Design a protein with these regions (language model features):
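Iron-sulfur cluster-binding electron-transfer modules in prokaryotic oxidoreductases
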Residues: 76-401
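Iron-sulfur cluster-binding cysteine motifs and their immediate structural context
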Residues: 10, 14-38, 54, 59, ...
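Alpha-helix capping and helix-loop boundary segments enriched in small/acidic/polar residues
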Residues: 7, 26-30, 197-204
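Active-site-flanking structural segment that lines cofactor/substrate pockets
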Residues: 40-55, 139-149
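Generic start-of-chain signal for non-secretory N-termini
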Residues: 1-7
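Short, charged low-complexity linear segments at domain edges
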Residues: 1, 30-51, 294-305, 332-335
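Cys/His-enriched microdomains
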Residues: 7-13, 17, 58-68, 191, ...
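Secondary-structure capping and boundary motifs in well-ordered enzyme cores
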Residues: 8-11, 49-55, 59-62, 168, ...
Length: 401
């Protein structure tokens, strides 16, 4: 926690309406201003870091909605990451079970081998619904494989997305092939980007995984990432590691919808991505926080959907859904309170469109958000999957050949 960073906050409070935990509790200590005051008090020796103070800091979802709202440019994301790292090093946050679980993510085969056991646990109702895991089949889908060792683009496969949402990777690959691009996938070393570890305050592990990810996709080809949280983390490797190599790698990272929007705006590829079906799905856009507040590519979601879907906008100014990486497992009650506001906003938008949940789909470009909202009964889809299915064939039930 840098005193210089802390000093940038002037206490104006313009961040408060944008903070999900403040919105649902009304507690000053559960706002960015309140949490910065705790950081300031602790660093100046005026405040004891007791259990309450730790809890106030730990219950930040790290959505970073406060950053674009702040006229002083307070680097809140960097500050709360530093605070979480200090607390994690002291054993005050991120319990052992979470650390062990996150360390398993680097062992990708183990994650995939666990699928049948997790599928069985789901059917025995041993997996809490609030985790939002999709109902898993007994067998893993075929992994995405690269088409060349010298790709035009890389597609990050990662850990959670590759375990449970491989369909979206396939959508990215099929769209790349449609415009004539050869794709590569990371070597086994790049099985996890470290985003969840950063959220949990596991700073050293975050750096190690970032360096492994960088080694797994060498060269200068763009890196397409279809998980908003992963893309945000990888675009900040330059800040995390602080080397010219890391900054150059971050410059290569592009979110999948950002990449698609560029292709649709290019005269060379736009026609290849034109919709081939007359019917338009009705889509509610739910912006993941790391799309909207960190990467600032939420406009690209609208660009890729506007010509092929009837888009319904929410009126909640991009309020967080409450998922926050592993947040919903650590603070389920607060996460569900935040989610309830998001679900209410989505239902209100659906009602205003004179539709029902069965008539629409909710587009979200982050696996944590989509799984957490799916657990509340919402029909979730990745924007890239929606785009793919308006161009390439599916059967009457939406299955792909």
């Amino acid at each position: 926690m840098s005193p210089d960073d802390i000093a940038t906050c002037v206490g104006c409070g313009l961040c408060l309406p944008h903070c999900p935990t403040f919105r649902v509790t009304g507690e000053e200590a559960l706002s960015p201003r309140g949490r910065i005051a705790i950081m300031k008090g602790v660093t100046e020796g005026l405040l004891e870091l007791d259990a309450d103070s730790v809890s106030f800091l730990d219950t930040c979802i790290q959505c970073r909605a406060c950053e674009p709202a702040c006229p002083s440019g307070v680097p809140y994301g960097r500050m709360i990451e530093g605070a979480k790292s200090d607390l994690a090093n002291d054993g005050r946050v991120s319990p052992r079970w979470l650390r062990v679980g996150l360390r398993l993510l680097r062992h990708h085969r183990l994650l995939l081998w666990s699928r049948p056991f997790l599928a069985l646990a789901q059917r025995l109702r041993l997996v809490p619904r609030r985790l939002g895991l999709p109902l898993l089949s007994w067998r893993n889908e075929e992994p995405l494989r690269g088409t060349t060792t010298e790709p035009d683009v890389w597609i990050l496969t990662g850990c959670v997305m590759d375990a449970w949402q491989r369909r979206t990777h396939r959508s990215v690959a099929e769209l790349a092939e449609r415009v004539g691009l050869r794709h590569g996938v990371p070597s086994r070393e790049g099985s996890c980007c470290g985003a969840l570890h950063t959220h949990a305050g596991m700073h050293e592990e975050s750096i190690e995984l970032a360096e492994r990810t960088m080694r797994s996709m060498p060269g200068e080809a763009p890196i397409i990432v279809d998980s908003a949280g992963c893309g945000a983390a990888m675009k900040e490797y330059g800040r995390l590691i602080g080397t010219a190599e890391a900054r150059a790698f971050s410059e290569r990272v592009v979110d999948a919808v950002e990449w698609l929007a560029g292709l649709m705006d290019s005269a060379d590829t736009a026609a290849l991505l034109a919709p081939t079906r007359p019917e338009k799905p009705t889509v509610v856009i739910q912006d993941p926080c790391h799309h909207r507040h960190v990467q600032k590519v939420h406009g690209a979601t609208r660009r890729v959907l506007r010509d092929r879907a009837t888009v319904i906008e929410l009126t909640d100014d991009g309020l967080c859904c409450g998922a926050g990486g592993a947040y919903s497992t650590l603070h389920p009650r607060l996460a569900e309170d935040v989610r309830d506001r998001k679900v209410s906003a989505i239902d209100a938008a659906i009602d205003a469109a004179r539709a029902g949940r069965h008539d629409i789909m909710v587009a979200s470009a982050n696996p944590g958000c989509s799984m957490f909202l799916a657990a509340a009964g919402l029909p979730m889809r990745h924007p890239v999957d929606i785009v793919r299915d308006t161009i390439l064939p599916t059967d009457a039930e939406g299955n792909r050949p």
